[in-house]
Amino acid sequence: MCALDRRERPLNSQSVNKYILNVQNIYRNSPVPVCVRNKNRKILYANGAFIELFSREDKPLSGESYIRLQVEIFLSSLELECQALGHGSAFCRRFNFHGEIYQIRMENVSFYNDESVVLWQINPFPDYPFFALNQSGSNTNTSDKLTIWNDLSPGTLVVFSFYMLGVGHATIARELGITDRASEDRIKPVKRKIKEFFEHV
């Protein structure tokens, strides 16, 4: 059997309580929002950063990403996906919350007593200014190049990253949950800006 096959990974020999204590020791004072939930979606542990993140007041008129319940429903659906993948599985996904983009990492951990938990770790997703640097007037060439990227939206940068790796628009659209046309439209301003830049070089 392949060494990377999750079916062959040994279950965690420690108890759930011991596992939670280990997580608590690592993340108690961490700025990274972290929680551990059981298969019934009950929070067994959440650090202060997690509690603070999800204590923001709802703003119903600002869209679904400003309503905590809507965001929690989306994250719970990801958690079910992680549980379905089985012990040892882990993945990262992006989500919007209160106008900010975050990346969540979920990991499924199973134990010998037939218990399992999902570890959540949340980070702010990199946003523009893209490759932000402290520029001095002495290096105008570098500053001009960075301006190309700073003017692009995060959504355009994500599509462009896939596009530069040779991924087709149909695949990009499927992975990002957008239409093929939207993927193509996001590339057009990048091509235009690059063309304008090199015409002046």
From Swiss-Prot:
Keywords of this entry: Activator, Conjugation, Cytoplasm, Plasmid, Transcription, Transcription regulation
GO biological process: regulation of DNA-templated transcription
Principal cellular location given in the protein's record: cytoplasm
Subcellular localization, as worded in the UniProt entry: Cytoplasm
Gene3D superfamilies: PAS domain
Gene Ontology CC: one annotated term: cytoplasm
InterPro entries in UniProt: PAS-like_dom_sf, PAS_fold, TraJ_R1
Function, in words: This protein is essential for positively regulating the expression of transfer genes that are involved in the conjugal transfer of DNA between bacterial cells.
Name of the protein this chain belongs to: Protein TraJ
Encoding gene per record: traJ
